Amino acid sequence: MNVFLSKYVNGVDKKSRVSVPANYRAVLGKELFNGVIAYPSIRNNCIEACGISHIEKLKQMIETLDPYSEERDAFETMIFGEAVQLSFDGDGRVILPQSLMKHAGIEEQACFVGKGVIFEIWQPQNFEKHLKSAQKIAHEQRFTLRNAN
């Protein structure tokens, strides 16, 4: 399966290492790079992570914007300028940069949340707050998916 699913909470050690869930690594294993691309989310106070193929799709979408527009500059700066390639160690862990941990408020635990083509890494309590909001919105908008053909 090529989809990031489920939610996992893993500990972050004193060296900022965290284990990426095995099924996420299996999805990423189909990529050319043995690791993950991570960048600060522009939607939430979390880290977004994906494989190189998704970064290529983002690049194609951003390239459709006017090359001199503020929007394109902002997307290129926030996604490509802030992105880091995190390699897996022998135990399936990555080292989270302090800048990304600070952006997401991550200290001792990280909550991995599958979002289909990407996954997010949250501070667990912040994700629980976000989940409550998402549940409300999903319930209110549940009929939207009916017409999503």
UniProtKB/Swiss-Prot annotation:
GO cellular component terms, semicolon-separated: cytoplasm; nucleoid
Keyword Transcription: yes
Record localization: Cytoplasm, Nucleoid
Pfam families: MraZ
Keyword Heme: no
Keywords from the UniProt entry: Cytoplasm, DNA-binding, Repeat, Transcription, Transcription regulation
Main subcellular location: cytoplasm
SpoVT-AbrB domain ranges (all copies): 7-54, 83-126
Gene Ontology biological process terms, A to Z: negative regulation of DNA-templated transcription initiation
Single annotated GO MF: DNA-binding transcription factor activity
Family: Belongs to the MraZ family.
Subunit structure: Forms oligomers.
PANTHER family with a match to the protein in the record: TRANSCRIPTIONAL REGULATOR MRAZ
Name of the protein: Transcriptional regulator MraZ
Gene this chain is encoded by: mraZ
